[in-house]
Amino acid sequence: MKLALDRRLFLSLAGMGAGAAALSACGGPSTAVGTGPSETALNFDGVTPAASIDFWSNHPGKSQDVEKDMIARFEAKNPGIKVNLVTAGANYEEIAQKFQTAQAAKSGLPALVVLSDVWWFRYYLNGNIIPLDSLISQLDVKLDDFRTSLVDDYKYDGQQWALPYGRSTPLFYYNKDHFAAAGLPDRAPATWQEFAEWAPKLKATTRAQYAFMHPALAGYAGWTLQNNLWGEGGSWSRDWEVTCDSAESVAALQAAQDSVYKDAWAGVSSKESADDFAAGLASATVSSTGSLIGILKSATFNVGVGFLPGGSKAKTEVCPTGGAGLGIPSGVTPEEQLAAAMFLQFVTEPENTAAFSAATGYMPTRKSADMTAVLAKTPQIKTAMDQLAVTRVQDNARAFLPGADQEMAKAAAKILTQEADVKTTMTELKATLEGLYNTDVKPKLKA
């Protein structure tokens, strides 16, 4: 069944109050319908910044130390404001759950919160976050200095709803020592077909358990498998037509299953493939750019990074973006919002985005960030920066259907850990995704 709905029309209807539960990108808590975003322009003239604010973070890319350092430097520069760093979860889903709980209780909200690049729109629909435009103007934030594709992710209806923070793409990580021992070139494979030819050589010449480790499914499947799907001309969806059961999509996922069972050169991580790779369990993996610094610190071998491989149908523009931004909740006082904006401005200054990138591997979000010293120390970060030019917008089915990410992960688990029939599993997933559309999206659009 084709879900015939233009993406732009969908978003315009949603923006008029079509319903907050209509849109979701990562897996996570369901969201009650809110009052919607306020159309009243915010005015902070005469507002004094709060003396203390809470900053909720899940410390993406193991960034707690660099976050503490930025807070200390901000407080030294602004002695009248104290920033309390709160660990609000171990990942984007957990921090979203905590934020939704605080919203429901109408208490305990932070002044600044880390939000997934695809969670912000749900918060926008619920009226949970404020537009930043008046604060951007008042504080003279140089919005045009942000990397366009990253900052534009948070623009809607002519307003800016968040600023980019820990932004990432998946990268292909490989063990240079293993590749050399197997007589392979020192680069990422151009396609998954090429890596399938390399994999037996890696297994034969190294002590690694696997040539490749698939990322953990619960947190990554819906995101990273888009790469496999796109390379074969498949997708989770095209616009609003669910296409996960197409011949191309099935072929892509069949190849992934074959790597685990038929050809037996790949494993599936139970928790974090970056850690498995750094420990030497596999010769290669796919993981976020935010895993880069951790891998480089932990690995006892020479680490290589490259663009994600293409497939038989597409060899470029097969990489999705991801990561997190920072938003300011609507349910806190104007004084807290102003103080949060001042800290947000500080965190996103060029030198601080460079420092954050150096500490984590995430992409610097400012064009003017001086990355010379960072790249001299960690040249691998440039690969992530370069890959940004060939990324692709995520599929609508993952980005806007509530609960779709979990369903994709469940389907991937059946295929990659239970050897379920791929076509049958994708047919079932299609029915589930169409059900989500008909139940949670279509009724809202008629409202």
For each of these PLM feature ranges, what is it?
Residues 73-146, 181-183, 283-284, 294, ...:
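Extracytoplasmic "Venus flytrap"/periplasmic binding protein-like
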Residues 198-203, 239-267:
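Glycine-centered hinge/linker elements that transmit conformational signals in sensory
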Residues 76-77, 100, 182, 254, ...:
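Extracytoplasmic/periplasmic substrate-recognition and gating elements
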